[in-house]
Amino acid sequence: MERPALRVNLIFHDNGAGLSADAMIVASVLSTAGIQTTSSPYQAPPAWDRAAARVARWSGRPRYDLNIFLEHVDHRWWPMARRSMLIPNQEWFHPEWTRRLRGFDRVLCKTQYGLRIFQSLGARAEFLGFTSEDRRLLPGLPREEGVLHIAGRSLRKGTVIVLQAWQQHPEWPRLTVVQRPPQEGYPLWHPPLPNVTYHSHRLSDEEIRELQNRYWLHIRPSEAEGFGHPFAESMSCGAVVITTDAPPMNELVRPDRGILVPAHPTEPQGLVIRQEVEAPALEAAVVRALAMPVSEREEMGGQGRAWWETNDRAFRSRLKAVVAGVG
């Protein structure tokens, strides 16, 4: 007799950004394994729903086989499924959630850096990894002599330091900056520079993807990441990435597939300390990148693409295995 398909409940904040992308990726991977997924808001279910879920759980017939929490923790969802797992982002993890970690059957970590953090908190943590969408348009697409910096709505992507570097170097190639205010009316620092183009309005996904594939050099000096979607997307395009020499950024981007910039700690965020690149080191990294012959650029970009493909396959395999084990 064929076993019924597993029922997985994805619990997340549909923010139109990183968490939405995470949910889309997880749901897509599980669907290829014939696993049904339902999306639920991260706020707790209504009281009547929780009561019904407890009755179902006690009777051995919970609504779902597995809850997968993306970043947020709310134990009131636990009765809705036989098992509960968490895929956290350490930089957004609230300290008050720590006491709930032991209530999860597993904490699935996106990076080895995250794994060490959650193991130290006593969680039943294991390495899952993660992936990004494949952003490559066509292999071998001609590149332009320009540089791309995408910050989205974040103020923690090193944008100010990148712009300060370009202020000092009017001879550098054109920098394209994609950054929107984190909230309406917020003043962004976008100084008028002859070799900088700003996109401070919302671009379509197609427009962003075209930019990612147009430029061979992407500058992504993040202060903190849960996984590193920005770098993974850049490497999927075969771009050379300049980023922060601190975890987890330097776990994804290694010297054979990018350029790492020394950083210093600044302020705590969640379970981590933010890391800010040093301005002279960033300038040196850009100078080094611009001096690379085309053959070296292509070799480094090819290494990044190869890493993305290997990592993507491994993540998909691990996620399917973890969820299948619930059945």
What function would you assign to each model-found segment?
Residues E223:
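Aromatic "clamp/platform" in nucleotide-sugar-dependent glycosyltransferases that forms part
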Residues M1-L70, S317:
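N-terminal pre-catalytic "stem/leader" segment of glycosyltransferase-like enzymes
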